Amino acid sequence: MQLIYQCAWIVPLCPLISSILIGLGLLFFEKSTKSIRRICAISCILSLSVATVICYNLSYEQIIDNSIYQYSWSWISNGDIVLEFGYLIDPLTCIMLVLVTSVAIIVMIYSDGYMSHDEGYVRFFVYLSLFTASMLGLVLSPNLIQIYIFWELVGMCSYLLIGFWFTRPSAANACQKAFITNRIGDFGLLLGILGFYWITGSFEFENLFKGFKDLLINNEVSPFFAILCASFLFLGPVAKSAQFPLHVWLPDAMEGPTPISALIHAATMVAAGIYLVARMFPLFETLPFVMSVISWTGAVTALLGATLAFFQKDLKRGLAYSTMSQLGYMMLALGIGSYRAGLFHLITHAYSKALLFLGSGSVIHSMEPIVGYRPDESQNMIFMGGLRKHMPITGTTFLLGTLSLCGIPPFACFWSKDEIIADSWLYSPFIGWIALLTAGLTSFYMFRIYFLTFEGEFRANSFKENTPVSSVSLWGEFRFEEFGEKKADSVLQIVEKSSPKEFFRFVQSNRESSETQIGNYLSAYPSKEPIHFLYPKESDYTMLIPLLILSIPTLLIGFIGAPLPNGQLGSDLLSHWLNSFGNLSPERLSENWLEFIEDAITSISIASFGIFSAFILYGPASIFPRDLEKKIEPQLKGVWGFFINYMYNWSQYRGYIDQYYNKIFVEGTRILAYASSFFDRWIIDGIVNGTGISSFSGGEGMRYGEGGRVSSYLFGLVFGMTILLAVILLII
């Protein structure tokens, strides 16, 4: 047992070494390194495999004996200041190690197929290995200083990966946005770390928690200052885990390659914030006000993310907002004291969301040769539809991930999400309603994504550049009236202008076969040149095998925390594992199996309603009458129509939050810079330059006055005496 614990330092070292060696080869021997790029990828995968084996052995030992192991050695020692470097092995560490390594190795295998035609193939694996090593170092850290170091490395790697295609302006802007937004959180995190060091005199977790609790009980620390430091510390997870109001970087992060989107949004960067809150949970739970802030931040983020995902047209962006919403669930659970439920949802969501993102990557990879390689084309769900026929494995695995995220039993997320909703009701009815409403919205937008992507008929062939819009009846009479016989230079010009009503018409009309519509068009507009229609095809095995592997935990991983039918909850494997960590709150757990069934019925009902609503609006055509649109047309008017349009604009414009930030911070900073420039140029420089100009002018005047002419002196004397007499007379 001791041997495997002593080998824990190898875990982050394995991917770090492969990243450094391949990176140096790419830097100094670029052509030679690129010529053996497949060997480089295999070496990255093998090095991470070694780390994965060690992590699983560590977890096995933890499950058996529930012991906590910490090893540290002195790094800096200068009087009272002692900084140590080492690693900590406890249940939380093992959970995160297994999560990060298992998802990362699957993403690496998947990336071999997805990035095979990219010139930056080797560079991508270098960044990916460094990213994984940074996250593994973060979760092994036994103190706040070491966490902060790896925290910054994770942020740097995310900057490199989001901006991987840096020649694309949108990607360059996205990585800068992510970096700057996270700077705000990192600054708060640093202030919080320094504040707690000032209070307790230690960076080590055990000493920090014990010392702070004793000081708080003995009233030796100001509660206000403690709350301030904890709030600053919480600012780091708010930015890193995309919590409101520092969530704005997350959808733009979709500019990076899809495999890294899966890793960032499943097990690494966004999970780092949740991990830090869980790690600092013994400290936060002593401050009820901070716990309330955490819970409400999570609740607002969960609901906001769900509403922003409501009418997204971009496949990856819809999944990004889904991630934001689910991270809100986790933060909410930790804030209400449901430590186990928060970690449980972190585990189940990681595998389900990784499956969904890799599935979306398979779709995008197949769509690019047909519609183009721009993200607003290959990721646009308007061009998709019917992909399950052409990509059955991708479609089936994507459906499994969707069912899991919606909370449908027996899939993984059902068990964790249901527990969060139940515990939310015990904490506060308001938060309970938010959690329940978010569950319904999640089911709606996730199945909206699934239906638009995989069901119906393939729609990309219905759009041909420079084709009269009226020739293919996809937009209804309204579109014909608006565009007439004008030709569309780009389909995207039409797509971006579409309203919710027109988009609904588009989906309804596409329940008929696209081939039939195009056949009618060809009959009406014969052409001498034959038109060939392309269809997506299933991805190769290097991309399909990871999807099939991730389907297994998506279906089964939830059972590690599922309640056993013995009349009591908390007797499952996850609870047994976490009991040694001492952070469970049994009073917040449901009491028995029957109560769990009652709560489950409620959550399943609201999820089913969301699925049914999505099915009505976006589902397959076979069970719907063709005049369904006319039947619901009156319902789209009035207050309901206003609500739909408002939600559409709310979703498309990201809740107007980016616009507010642009007005307040960007334009405000520009105005402040202009005012500063004006003050510097005309006031500061004016005083300096004015002094010189005044001296020069005075000197010139005196030079001309001292010309040596008696008449000038006499005139000056008379003029001066006249002025003096006038002043005296005025005074008298």
From Swiss-Prot:
Keywords: Chloroplast, Membrane, NAD, NADP, Plastid, Plastoquinone, Quinone, Thylakoid, Translocase, Transmembrane, Transmembrane helix, Transport. It is a multi-pass membrane protein. It is found in: Plastid, Chloroplast thylakoid membrane. It catalyses: a plastoquinone + NADH + (n+1) H(+)(in) = a plastoquinol + NAD(+) + n H(+)(out); a plastoquinone + NADPH + (n+1) H(+)(in) = a plastoquinol + NADP(+) + n H(+)(out). InterPro entries: NADH_UbQ_OxRdtase_chlpt_su5_C, NADHpl_OxRdtase_5_subgr, ND/Mrp_TM, NU5C-like, Proton_antipo_N. One of its GO terms (molecular function) is quinone binding. The chain crosses the membrane at residues 9-29, 39-59, 89-109, 125-145, 147-167, 184-204, 215-235, 258-278, 291-311, 327-347, 353-373, 395-415, 420-440, 544-564, 604-624, 712-732. It comes from the Eukaryota. The keyword Thylakoid applies. It is an enzyme of class 7 (translocase). Its main location: plastid. NDH is composed of at least 16 different subunits, 5 of which are encoded in the nucleus. PANTHER family: NADH-UBIQUINONE OXIDOREDUCTASE CHAIN 5. Belongs to the complex I subunit 5 family. NCBIfam families: NDH_I_L, PRK06590.1. This is NAD(P)H-quinone oxidoreductase subunit 5, chloroplastic. The gene is ndhF.
